[in-house]
Amino acid sequence: MAQSLRLHFAARRSNTYPLSETSGDDLDSHVHMCFKRPTRISTSNVVQMKLTPRQTALAPLIKENVQSQERSSVPSSENVNKKSSCLQISLQPTRYSGYLQSSNVLADSDDASFTCILKDGIYSSAVVDNELNAVNDGHLVSSPAICSGSLSNFSTSDNGSYSSNGSDFGSCASITSGGSYTNSVISDSSSYTFPPSDDTFLGGNLPSDSTSNRSVPNRNTTPCEIFSRSTSTDPFVQDDLEHGLEIMKLPVSRNTKIPLKRYSSLVIFPRSPSTTRPTSPTSLCTLLSKGSYQTSHQFIISPSEIAHNEDGTSAKGFLSTAVNGLRLSKTICTPGEVRDIRPLHRKGSLQKKIVLSNNTPRQTVCEKSSEGYSCVSVHFTQRKAATLDCETTNGDCKPEMSEIKLNSDSEYIKLMHRTSACLPSSQNVDCQININGELERPHSQMNKNHGILRRSISLGGAYPNISCLSSLKHNCSKGGPSQLLIKFASGNEGKVDNLSRDSNRDCTNELSNSCKTRDDFLGQVDVPLYPLPTENPRLERPYTFKDFVLHPRSHKSRVKGYLRLKMTYLPKTSGSEDDNAEQAEELEPGWVVLDQPDAACHLQQQQEPSPLPPGWEERQDILGRTYYVNHESRRTQWKRPTPQDNLTDAENGNIQLQAQRAFTTRRQISEETESVDNRESSENWEIIREDEATMYSNQAFPSPPPSSNLDVPTHLAEELNARLTIFGNSAVSQPASSSNHSSRRGSLQAYTFEEQPTLPVLLPTSSGLPPGWEEKQDERGRSYYVDHNSRTTTWTKPTVQATVETSQLTSSQSSAGPQSQASTSDSGQQVTQPSEIEQGFLPKGWEVRHAPNGRPFFIDHNTKTTTWEDPRLKIPAHLRGKTSLDTSNDLGPLPPGWEERTHTDGRIFYINHNIKRTQWEDPRLENVAITGPAVPYSRDYKRKYEFFRRKLKKQNDIPNKFEMKLRRATVLEDSYRRIMGVKRADFLKARLWIEFDGEKGLDYGGVAREWFFLISKEMFNPYYGLFEYSATDNYTLQINPNSGLCNEDHLSYFKFIGRVAGMAVYHGKLLDGFFIRPFYKMMLHKPITLHDMESVDSEYYNSLRWILENDPTELDLRFIIDEELFGQTHQHELKNGGSEIVVTNKNKKEYIYLVIQWRFVNRIQKQMAAFKEGFFELIPQDLIKIFDENELELLMCGLGDVDVNDWREHTKYKNGYSANHQVIQWFWKAVLMMDSEKRIRLLQFVTGTSRVPMNGFAELYGSNGPQSFTVEQWGTPEKLPRAHTCFNRLDLPPYESFEELWDKLQMAIENTQGFDGVD
């Protein structure tokens, strides 16, 4: 991740011209701020950012003659910053009045000082050498003194604000605007005391030479008056900039490596949010002595020395001036701690005054202005007592007095952004203004220490010809200070330079009465950092902003509005070796930089991307992911297109054909039963090779008993294991046969070997009859017997012994081929001899037979049905391996009071008349002492589907066919008009007859299937805005909650899509669209749980899971939720009055439920209702409920052929598993033994969808992008496998046998809702 984070504030931005990359004078007129995140890492999760837009009144003018000289140093210390994943931004505003006049100030960053250019009418004072200019004719003369040991200066803002700065082994800076007044004095060894007096105001810096240590006797110390003449109350205009400017400089560091970018004023507070409610801004009581408050316009500077002031006398002075009722908290700050400062509003007119004295320990500030406004306060101290060096007349020191009058008629300046900072690493002592207007010093001792500037301050506003830049730099490893760089760029630099040479200018400044303001909390936002893009410096930055809803700090806060930000990561550049060394030094021990890009990655990242081909557009979805839209073909893709990749029509057709081929391979599970009426007809049997027949003949016996030549399970298990080990990776995948008679047929498509001679054919055999014999009944009900061996019939029941010899003879004759007689004889014995053994393991009423090609199938005489699936797989492994059980597998009679019945869909269930309850499990299997645990209910999707097809009856009062004539170029629009034009939806149940314009042909099913493919690609295309890709991948869909903004008739289109989906299900066709799991649950009217969110949005899921498992009270969450729409964030209440309800342990489950309902149900309720209205017009709602959400996906989208070779090749193993591990070998053996349905169900269990990407498992997606299928060792053999759908990971315990793995895996797949198997 890039180390620099760029934040842009869009406060009425008018120009967006790029800035120079070097710090100079060529600044634009906008607000900028750069915060460089340090590589020094801690363990915090929140970085608090405060933005404080302020405004104060425009001050009138005061003239003075000064001469400026200054020097200053800012000590440095090590900054310790915290690692963050979220920015918490707090806003602190002030009431605004007036507007900012056009004025410009220019500063040179190369000069080690802060330059402030003043105009006529703006007060400025500087430093003179050991002299104090007198006041003549009522004009103000400021006389600060400065020598080698003490430095100070005064700086003013561009609109009449007054600030001062002086430092020597202690730094102080104070900046205000709009007439607000602050004063700061820092001295190396001087101390000042001021006697109380009325109508006095400190108007200048009073430092002294630290080496002279002079003192002024009390008899010579008279108040220094500073008179103000209201000579002009005219507004401050732009023309005044052209003459009468004063330059003052504040020292800054030269070593700043951050280029000038477009930023705004921000301050980062690396501390947790406030837990103590701040005092009311209108309260007259004092602040608490301790507590953590959100700051408001405050600098804290570490004290040089804490003074004792207990007995009313002071040996060491402390001075801080506040204006208009600004109250400073009396407290001692810990490093990084910031106190709250609020303006004190009082009635009546107070006059500001500061009383100076030599023998009093108190410094007082009284205010008598009825119009108060807040300002910046600087906390600092002085160390030793020193005398005031001033110019005297006739041996007397006559400091002047000044009375400042406030005029409420003056014009004001509006400052849009304002920052504050915290600095000290030692204890700080603040002054507090009591209700009498006195500034009291705390009774604490100040320790000697350097003042450290730890953050930067800047003023800015989005106004013409004014810009402000604040650059914040961290030098953690070398202990360097944060650097302050404030620049005011004027539109006419030449005139400024000429005027800056004149150091003696007369300035007049009038302070007027300002209206009452209050400094209140605007709100705070949490900004996620993970989806932020990285900026390319070679390209023009797209100024796309996001609006974040302002949240309250506590339940008593009332906030409203948005914070608009544009944030990007600054790209890493190939910096010097010193920069890399600094980054290495700044890392704390124990931290390692991961995913460090190499030089090639750097070069690739810095390469300028090629322009998009014509007709392409770059966009971003709601998750910040970039995708590209092809307006010519109306397609979207994730990969950036290039002119070389611009596909021709033929290549596009090939891709379309490939997608269609993948779609056509999907099928319904019982398609073969719909077209085949006579199963026993010889021409309907499928030709199958020996390897397939061998694999399926007795797959239920993987656990071999002791060696026996007639043991079929032993031979099959050994052969299957050998093939998995030897030929598993080299087998060639072949397409499935066009005659899909069995769902199990697709499971062997990945393994094709050399043709082998077929096994001896064992013809259909009835139970209790010799092989090849079958019992049938004639029309009168008489039984007769058919000998398929000789193709004869007889009324006499044949004996078993006579037919065994015939079977052996037939087997040896039919096995003639390249194999030896010995192997032929063995093969014949393997098939013919264990007939009773095979049937002995079958359940009661079942029989196994073989097709002419040797493929076994099973007959259930209880229900008179046949199946390719071995029913023995449904018996627990420990039962299958026990030969001591009865050969008929008869578990005995049912317990007393029980009854066995068959459901309407063919499933067997049991009735307990004792307690009047029903269940699917056989009660005889509940006797653990005899048979072990009960067999869980297995969802038989095939039976459900067949029952569903039987219930769908065609109505008689509809036409024979439903015709549609369409154009391929406008298939969506033509289909919409034709289908929605049908008033009676039953007409859509007629046979489909589709013709494409300009094409001749008869539609006997193939054209309709192609139409469903084409219409699916159009309906579910995110280009039209009706659907969008889910958060986890780019092939599962969800309804776009903002579809109404893309299409006014979106509800009509959703009804159309519902009708098309119903037509596909009714006619047995498929849709090429896969939805998220909550979509299918909503169709079935099932409740959506927290587990369903994991596969859709893992970040959201983890947040809600944390709330469920922890106490959310400290998060200060409300029953509200934010939604982003086109860059703006909107706020929705989850319940009435939700913004006032705090989420606690008692109501957190309700909160999670409401969040899930809003996320999946409420936002798309209208769209989903329209879709279900169209769907249920063709499919009965009660009939569809026999399926679960996974089976409903198979019903709508069909079963696909899973390439096991590709699946296995792109699977990863973790935590001790490897490709050669025994459990992994058993796992893939189980996958091979599964039919297509079971494989799809396994895929759904692990990944959440039955669809495999077009290019195979290599492009399988997870919640964080491409994520391969993973099998990880976890748990103990007693546990069931579990899945993580967001990571495509299967947690597989190390089972001790294949039978145990098979049982547990089947149970997990079939009963995912019955246990916590997916998390």
From Swiss-Prot:
Gene name for this UniProt entry: NEDD4
PANTHER family cross-referenced by the UniProt entry: E3 UBIQUITIN-PROTEIN LIGASE NEDD4, HECT DOMAIN UBIQUITIN-PROTEIN LIGASE
Organism: Homo sapiens (Human)
Low complexity: bias regions: 810-825
Domain WW per the UniProt entry, residue ranges: 610-643, 767-800, 840-873, 892-925
Residues annotated as catalytic: C1286
Protein name: E3 ubiquitin-protein ligase NEDD4
Membrane topology qualifier: Peripheral membrane protein
Stored InterPro entries: C2_domain_sf (IPR035892), E3_ubiq-protein_ligase (IPR050409), HECT_dom (IPR000569), Hect_E3_ubiquitin_ligase (IPR035983), WW_dom (IPR001202), WW_dom_sf (IPR036020)
Phylogenetic lineage: Eukaryota, Metazoa, Chordata, Craniata, Vertebrata
